[in-house]
């Protein structure tokens, strides 16, 4: 990223110039303040910094094309994604966010006789899409280490789709790469493994890996990605999946024609070409997250080891009153997850937002 774009990005974010190292979160003594009318939003695992400057410019320029259908832009993005992952274009399908990929997978491969198996807790949308297809949803609790219990999940009979969110939402935890490989190898060919890698870019553990390179060997593997997280485009909706062509064809049968919009396609294309934005975003998130975790631990709370842009705090008390009290203090945190009723999910925002979070959290939990 050149110096001009660094200055522009810093000004847009309102936090000064982008730097390789940032000042400690809690070294400053000035009182925190809310950055947004209505409170600080740490509830949806969004990227507080937004898209890269190049992506924002591309989306602005694409407004001149909104009178045209998106066919050419779709083809261009598919080509870029295929090249990125070293597959042919017929291995790629686009979606309005990775949520549409989940919906297409449920529609194509689950039914009243083919179940959807998922962890508990995990991202709930897959269960909703499965029920819309008339499929039974089987929930398997996470292990004590907050990993997917893949052996139990694979053992569910008549499974049409097994959904694995890795890193997992809402726990920010990972499932070991060796266990994932063994799981994929053990599945019958008529059971689809849908691996959701929405938070892939934030994971840096040596025990984690993307399974996209395994697609060529696994005819029953679908891998979902999104532009909503590290790329900062949650509001514009764009995602994709990688799978073998036979699966892509079945998913395309469930997809609306020309469902993508040219603005999102332009932003996604530019985002994939701006690798510096990803590197800087990961660095910012990691440093801010680590300092927040340290502050929370100093208050005596356990935090699930995080490989994402959010954390899960074990409050050892019912979480609903804390959620409500945090909101009353101007900080919106994650929703209640019934499988973990004493855990609080918190998105990692900007350093200033997280100072406000720590102050409010200390007050609420005192």
Model-derived regions, located:
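PLP-dependent enzyme catalytic core of the Aspartate aminotransferase-like
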Residues: 325-329, 337-366
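PLP-dependent aminotransferase-like
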Residues: 108-165
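N-terminal export signals
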Residues: 1-28
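Phosphate-binding glycine-rich loop
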Residues: 76-115, 129, 133
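Conserved PLP-binding catalytic core of the aspartate aminotransferase-like
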Residues: 142, 286, 295-329, 352
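Active-site pre-lysine segment of PLP-dependent enzymes
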Residues: 149-158, 173-193, 197-230
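C-terminal segment of N-terminal export signals and the immediately downstream linker at the start
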Residues: 23-68, 83, 257
């Amino acid at each position: 990223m050149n110096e001009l774009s660094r200055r522009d990005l810093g000004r847009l974010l309102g936090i000064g110039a982008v730097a390789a190292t940032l000042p400690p979160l809690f070294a400053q003594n000035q009182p925190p303040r809310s950055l947004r009318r209505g409170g600080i939003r740490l509830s949806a695992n969004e990227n507080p910094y937004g898209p890269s400057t190049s992506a924002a410019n591309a989306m602005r320029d694409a407004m001149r094309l909104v009178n045209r259908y998106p066919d050419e832009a779709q083809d261009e993005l598919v080509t870029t994604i295929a090249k990125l992952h070293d597959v042919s274009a017929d291995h790629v399908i686009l979606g309005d966010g990775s949520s549409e990929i989940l919906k297409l997978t449920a529609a194509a491969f689950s039914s009243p006789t083919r179940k959807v198996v998922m962890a508990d807790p995990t991202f709930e949308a897959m269960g909703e899409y499965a029920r819309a297809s008339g499929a039974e949803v089987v929930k398997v609790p996470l292990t004590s280490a907050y990993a997917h219990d893949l052996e139990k999940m694979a053992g569910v009979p008549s499974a049409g789709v097994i959904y694995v969110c890795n890193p997992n939402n809402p726990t920010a935890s990972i499932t070991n790469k060796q266990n994932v490989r063994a799981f994929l190898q053990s599945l019958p060919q008529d059971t689809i493994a849908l691996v959701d890698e929405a938070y892939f870019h934030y994971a840096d553990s040596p025990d984690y890996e993307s399974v996209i390179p395994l697609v060529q060997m696994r005819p029953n593997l679908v891998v979902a990605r999104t532009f909503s997280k590290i790329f900062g485009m949650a509001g514009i909706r764009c995602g994709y999946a990688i799978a073998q062509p036979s699966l892509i064809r079945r998913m395309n049968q469930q997809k609306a024609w020309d469902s993508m919009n040219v603005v999102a396609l332009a932003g996604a294309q530019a985002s994939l070409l701006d690798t510096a934005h990803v590197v800087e975003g990961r660095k910012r998130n990691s440093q801010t997250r680590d300092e927040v975790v340290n502050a929370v631990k100093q208050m005596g709370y356990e935090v699930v080891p995080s490989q994402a842009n959010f954390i899960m705090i074990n409050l050892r008390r019912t979480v609903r009153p804390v959620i409500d009290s945090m909101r009353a203090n101007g900080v919106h945190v994650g929703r209640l997850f019934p499988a973990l009723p004493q855990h609080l999910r918190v998105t990692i925002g900007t350093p200033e937002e997280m100072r406000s979070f720590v102050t409010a959290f200390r007050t609420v939990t005192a």
